[in-house]
């Protein structure tokens, strides 16, 4: 069982962004390389998804032949000054590259770890197209998210129906002690409490009914790391919640209440949130 069905995207890949790239949003690119890989690039363009002379606010070039990742911009017909850093991606391995936009910079994250900040040289609002080229297999491209307050609380208009999944993208704070994700019932009870505790090195799972906690479940290691990003997926199945962390199945939590009665979401603790989805 997998939290995410693998897809295959054509390379070269071209896409038009339907809305403006705004601060808080993240571009997620996942794929894999081959042993013969030399280079691949991710580009954020203005006006067209090619190099016909229009500006390129961000050029990310992953170079195995040089052992570097190179960041640059193309403006007014000229490339700017390159910013280089050692390439942590290995030939033949899968990779996860995220580009999060902020008011003054792009935050580049490689395999869930902060890689480098790149200050804007062109307006973020000028970005309209995306291109991905080179020696890679591409299996996931997603753009979205925003700045989320923590604590975060929201009703779920359509609930979390059986067969659907909650996706939470975030980064654990470097001095984190705990965070939690709660799925709420209509009456305010907590159908599922998911609580990574770094001070105890466990992840607590529980439920709350009529103001009383049930029996804790805490088997298994804590798969989250301080200062490192994560993808958390909670699948609502008929008999249990299935939990995946960074694409790997983690635990199952048998339902203690009606699985069709999920009406709200709470997220709190020592994390930065970058995305929340239901799919």
UniProtKB/Swiss-Prot annotation:
Pfam families found in the cross-reference section: Gal-bind_lectin
A Gene Ontology cellular-component term: cuticular extracellular matrix
Gene3D superfamilies recorded: 2.60.120.200
A GO molecular-function annotation: galactoside binding
Record: residues binding a beta-D-galactoside: 213-219
Entry keyword annotation includes rRNA-binding: no
Keywords, sorted A to Z: Lectin, Repeat
Superkingdom of this protein's organism: Eukaryota
Cystine connections: none
Post-translational modification comment from the UniProt entry: The N-terminus is blocked.
UniProt xrefs under InterPro entries: ConA-like_dom_sf, Galectin-like, Galectin_CRD
Domain Galectin: 13-144, 152-279
Function noted in UniProt: Binds galactose.
Name this protein carries in UniProt: 32 kDa beta-galactoside-binding lectin
Organism: Caenorhabditis elegans
Lineage per the UniProt record: Eukaryota, Metazoa, Ecdysozoa, Nematoda, Chromadorea
